[in-house]
C-alpha cells in the first residue's frame, strides 16, 4: 500500500484550531503538513483524497508534473493515463484535460490567462515529443508522450466494454459524418451519444446555453473537443462544471480518425518530427506558427541549460 509522507492543505479550507489538530495527529504518524494559499476546488479537481485518523487531507502526489515554461506537464505514459481516466472519471466529470504541445506551451508562457487554463486542467498531457523529452532530461524517467489522437483511440477501443458514451464537439458537419462512420466501423459497440459542429463565430449566450443543454441531455461520459488550440482549451475552461462529462481537447484528432489527414509515419513520431510532417501537409497555415513557437521553445530550453 502507498504510504502518505506529506499532506498539503488549502489555507482557506480549515481554521487555525483545525490545522493545529491535523498537524498534531499527522506528526504522530510521521507525516509532514504544509499549508498553502490555493483554491480548494483546484486541489480537489487535481488530486486524490485520503484520511488520517478520519480527518480529510489532500495528497498532491497522485500526479507528478514537470514545469515547462510555467505549464505543469504531467509525467505519465499511456497506460498510467488510461488507469487514471478509469479510476477518476466520475470525480472528473465537469473538468477537462489539455493535450499540450510546443505551440500551446509557448502560447501559455506568453499568455497568463491561457497558462492558468492549462494549469487548472486535471491533466496537461505531453502530446508533443519535445515536452516528454524535456521532462526526462529533468530526471522524470517515466515521462512519455501521450498524444490526443492516440488517447482518443485507446479510450474508444475499450468503451464498449466499459459502457462509456461519447460526444464529439467541433469540426465541420462533413467531418463529423465521416468520423461517425469510421468510429462505428473500427470500434463495434461504441456509443456515440451525439455530435455538434458549432458555428465558426462566437455563440450568443442563449445559443451556448442551448448547446450545453443538448450535450448534457445525451448523458456522455467523454466530450471530445476538436476546435484547435487555443480555442478548445478556452472553451473547455469556460464550460467547466457546466458540461457534465470529462472534456478532452484533441485538436486534429477528428480529422485523423475521419481519414481527412494522414498521421506521420511512426519513425517520424518517434523522432519528434510529426510537426514537420504536418507542416508539409499544410505549410500555408502552419509555417509561421511553427517558426515562431519552435524557435521560442528552443531558445527557452537553451537558456534553461537543456
Residue ranges and their predicted role:
Residues 5, 122, 193, 221, ...:
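Conserved acidic residues
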Residues 16-19, 82, 176-177, 231-236:
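Short, well-ordered alpha-helical microsegments
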Residues 63-150:
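N-terminal nucleotide/polyanion-binding subdomain common to many enzyme families
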Amino acid at each position: 500500500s502507498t504510504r502518505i509522507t506529506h499532506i498539503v492543505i488549502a489555507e482557506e479550507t480549515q481554521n487555525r484550531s483545525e490545522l493545529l489538530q491535523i498537524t498534531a495527529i499527522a506528526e504522530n504518524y510521521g507525516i509532514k503538513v504544509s499549508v498553502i494559499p490555493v483554491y480548494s476546488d483546484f486541489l480537489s479537481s487535481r488530486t486524490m483524497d485520503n484520511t488520517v485518523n478520519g480527518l480529510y487531507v489532500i495528497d498532491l502526489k497522485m500526479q507528478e508534473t514537470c514545469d515547462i515554461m510555467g505549464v505543469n506537464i504531467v509525467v505519465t505514459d499511456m497506460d498510467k493515463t488510461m488507469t487514471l481516466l478509469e479510476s477518476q472519471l466520475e470525480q472528473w466529470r465537469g473538468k477537462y484535460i489539455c493535450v499540450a504541445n510546443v505551440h500551446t506551451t509557448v502560447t501559455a508562457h506568453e499568455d497568463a490567462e491561457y497558462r492558468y487554463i492549462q494549469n487548472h486542467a486535471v491533466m496537461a498531457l505531453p502530446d508533443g515529443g519535445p515536452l516528454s523529452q524535456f521532462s526526462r532530461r529533468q530526471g522524470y524517467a517515466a515521462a512519455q508522450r501521450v498524444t490526443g489522437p492516440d488517447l482518443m483511440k485507446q479510450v474508444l477501443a475499450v468503451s464498449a466494454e466499459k459502457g462509456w458514451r461519447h460526444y464529439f464537439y467541433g469540426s465541420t458537419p462533413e467531418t463529423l459524418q465521416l468520423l461517425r462512420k469510421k468510429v462505428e466501423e473500427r470500434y463495434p459497440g461504441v456509443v456515440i451519444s451525439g455530435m455538434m459542429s458549432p458555428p465558426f463565430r462566437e455563440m450568443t449566450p442563449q445559443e451556448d446555453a442551448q448547446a450545453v443543454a443538448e450535450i448534457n441531455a445525451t448523458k456522455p461520459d467523454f466530450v471530445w473537443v476538436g476546435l484547435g488550440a487555443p480555442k478548445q482549451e478556452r472553451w473547455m475552461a469556460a464550460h467547466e462544471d457546466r458540461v457534465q462529462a470529462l472534456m478532452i481537447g484533441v485538436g486534429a484528432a477528428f480529422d485523423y480518425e475521419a481519414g481527412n489527414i494522414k498521421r506521420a509515419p511512426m519513425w517520424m513520431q518517434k523522432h519528434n518530427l510529426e510537426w514537420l510532417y504536418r507542416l508539409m501537409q499544410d505549410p500555408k497555415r502552419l509555417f509561421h506558427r511553427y517558426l515562431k513557437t519552435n524557435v521560442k521553445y528552443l531558445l527557452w530550453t537553451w537558456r534553461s541549460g537543456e
